[in-house]
Each structure stands twice: as C-alpha cells, then as structure tokens.
C-alpha cells in the first residue's frame, strides 16, 4: 500500500520564513501582496498554526521563485 505524505506544518512555516527572508521580504510585504487587512494569517503560516490555501501556496511559490514542494515539508 502507498504511504501517504503527512504535512509538517511547523517545518512548512519555517520554510516560509526562510524563503521570505531569502527574497528580502517582510511580513508586511506579503500582507500587501495578498491584500490581507492584518498580517495574522502570514504569522499563523510561519508558526505552523495553519496552512496557506492551495491558491496562496501557488502565489508564495511564484513570489519566492520556487516550486510548491520547496515550501511544503512532509514528515519523514
């Protein structure tokens, strides 16, 4: 039987922080790109509390110039 991947939300959040910093972007910059009234969603992504939607993951991948697989981490 195929072993299905399990998303590691904390590691995914760490990837978002790392990739954001590599691009020289602030949380406010991402907030503006997404048009969020507050930065709370981005902080929740970064802390592994919630995951970005598929649509938002696609935008993050475009902004960071990586594949979505480079953002989402799975449990080994």
Which residues make up each language-model segment?
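Short alpha-helical DNA-recognition segment
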Residues: 24-44
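DNA major-groove recognition helix of helix-turn-helix
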Residues: 45-46, 56, 75
């Amino acid at each position: 039987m195929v072993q299905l991947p399990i998303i590691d939300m904390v590691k995914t959040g760490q990837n978002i922080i790392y990739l954001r910093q590599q691009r020289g972007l602030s949380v406010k910059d991402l907030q503006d790109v997404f048009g969020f009234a507050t930065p709370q969603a981005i902080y929740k992504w970064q802390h592994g509390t919630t995951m970005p939607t598929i649509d938002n993951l696609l935008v993050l991948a475009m902004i960071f110039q990586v594949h979505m697989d480079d953002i989402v981490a799975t449990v080994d």
